[in-house]
Swiss-Prot record:
Signal peptide: none annotated. Pfam families: B-CoV_A_NSP1, Peptidase_C16. The gene is rep. Residues 352-500 form the Peptidase C16 domain. This is Replicase polyprotein 1ab. The lineage of its organism: Viruses, Riboviria, Orthornavirae, Pisuviricota, Pisoniviricetes.
């Protein structure tokens, strides 16, 4: 059986529309926190966020059942029936979210799923539960470490949950709740991610300073320590991670560095501080005057400067770092020019191809302003635009099917459209379609076709009979549409390839 917990839906922002990534990992050890693999999970955002947030998301209309009296709410939850198959439960919930018929049923009290299981307040069948999670961001590109994510996981009738987090309620289709509870439904809406990069579009996501490198540690915590602390280290630079214990060690190293004298090491020889330091530096006492103390400080400073200068002179192996770009060498310049030539040529070719492609695309999709439709193979279609391919293809195919709209007004407009194109029918059909299907850059062909078929009725019949065993199959309505007027091969239960 597939692990249903691998499929979750993020609210209010989901990484993909309409279902979440299947590779999201759940950390069952700590139900309040979890880590996601390499991407920032869904974050709860308010609609007041500006920028590309509203561009990359679509608002989906649904409903919710508020928390009623304890006994009434418990009775409604016990009467919820979605489907006995967990996979069908997920599919029906996803379809309900797409067409705005999903309902959020919140319990009367804020308890865990295990607590409600002990009380016996659970749906009759598996249902999708809404959970609140605090997810860590491992991309190192966010100014915040954790995000709030609302995700869906399957809850079994015996109280076994295939997800984790703080339980909020059940998300079920409107057909799963009893009829008497539909009078208390309230309109509600959620925002789902349409596309773009994986992760959420938050105010601090993928934002960092221009000069900040991508390191596993903070650049401000880098300190330089004495080589005497580690004789086996090749590099005297010590990288201190951003932890509380190591921060204390770093502070002690910095404090001690101000009071120590710079000491350098050479190969096979170790320089020590001369004895003149002790002789030239008198011991300070409480009876000395301020003038004497000032002279002593000046003497100590001169000795330190002399020792540091001698140490630097005694290290002939040290070479000052230089920038290779500032080196004046004709060979290096020629080599750099030869290496950059292919890249420059490729960049110029890409620019030329982009210009030609844009010009060709504009010429292909250029439509006269007075042209509103065209006719192909006896079927009418709206004028060609860059973002209405889903509309044109669906309308052309539907004209060949024997369908009738359930609404009498739409049926009259449909007959007018088939007779000689009617723009009123197109406008009314597009306006009645769910907003989750129609996008600014286009639409979903399969979802729009399914919505179109759901608005129609079919007076079609198809009979199927096996030529070997004689078993018959009678199809009606939408099932018969897919076989109407065609000779389609079909495999019978007796393993015989029969025909209509």
């Amino acid at each position: 059986m597939a692990k249903m917990g691998k499929y979750g839906l993020g609210f209010k922002w989901a990484p993909e529309f309409p279902w979440m990534l299947p590779n999201a990992s759940e950390k069952l050890g700590n139900p309040e926190r979890s880590e996601e693999d390499g991407f920032c999970p869904s974050a709860a955002q308010e609609p007041k966020v500006k920028g590309k947030t509203l561009v990359n998301h679509v608002r989906v209309d649904c409903s919710r059942l508020p928390a009623l009296e304890c006994c009434v709410q418990s009775a409604i939850i016990r009467d919820i029936f979605v489907d006995e198959d967990p996979q069908k439960v997920e599919a029906s919930t996803m379809m309900a979210l797409q067409f705005g018929s999903a309902v959020l049923v919140k319990p009367s009290k804020r308890l865990s799923v295990q607590a409600w299981a002990k009380l016996g307040v659970l749906p009759k069948t598996p249902a999708m539960g809404l959970f609140k999670r605090f997810c860590l961001c491992n991309t190192r590109e966010c100014v915040c470490d954790a995000h709030v994510a609302f995700q869906l996981f399957t809850v079994q009738p015996d109280g076994v949950c295939l997800g984790n987090g703080r339980f909020i309620g059940w998300f079920v289709p409107v057909t799963a709740i009893p009829e008497y509870a539909k009078q208390w439904l309230q309109p509600w809406s959620i925002l789902l991610r349409k596309g773009g990069n994986k992760g959420s579009v938050t105010s601090g996501h993928s934002r960092r300073a221009v000069t900040m490198p991508v390191y596993d540690f903070n650049a401000t915590d880098v300190v330089y320590a004495d080589e005497n602390q580690d004789d086996d280290a090749d590099d005297p630079v010590v990288l201190v991670a951003d932890t509380q214990e190591e921060d204390g060690v770093a502070k002690e190293q910095v404090d001690s560095a101000d009071s120590e004298i710079c000491v350098a090491h050479t190969v096979g020889q170790e320089m020590t501080e001369p004895d003149a330091v002790g002789s030239q530096t008198p011991i300070a006492s409480a009876e000395e005057t301020e003038v004497g103390e000032a002279c002593d400080r000046e003497g100590i400073a001169e000795v330190k400067a002399t020792v540091c200068a001698d140490a630097l002179d005694a290290c002939p192996d040290q070479v000052e770092a230089f920038d290779i770009e500032k080196v004046e060498d004709s060979i290096l310049s020629e080599l750099q020019t030869e290496l950059n030539a292919p890249a420059d040529k490729t960049y110029e070719d890409v620019l030329a191809f982009d210009a030609i492609y844009s010009e060709t695309l504009s010429a292909f999709y250029a439509v006269p302003s007075d042209e509103t439709h065209f006719k192909v193979c006896g079927f009418y279609s709206p004028a060609i635009e860059r973002t209405n391919c889903w509309l044109r293809s669906t309308l052309i195919v539907m004209q060949s099917l024997p369908l009738e709209f359930k609404d009498l007004g739409m049926q009259k407009l449909w007959l007018s459209y088939k007779a000689g194109y009617d723009q009123c029918f197109v406008d009314k059909l597009v306006k009645s379609a769910p907003k989750s299907i129609i996008l600014p850059q286009g639409g979903y062909v399969a979802d729009f076709a399914y919505f179109f078929l759901s608005q129609c009725s079919f007076k079609v019949h198809a009979n199927w009979r096996c030529l070997k065993c004689g078993m018959e199959l009678k199809l009606q309505g939408l099932d018969a549409v897919f076989f109407y007027g065609d000779v389609v091969s079909h495999m019978c239960k007796c393993s015989f390839k029969a025909y209509f």
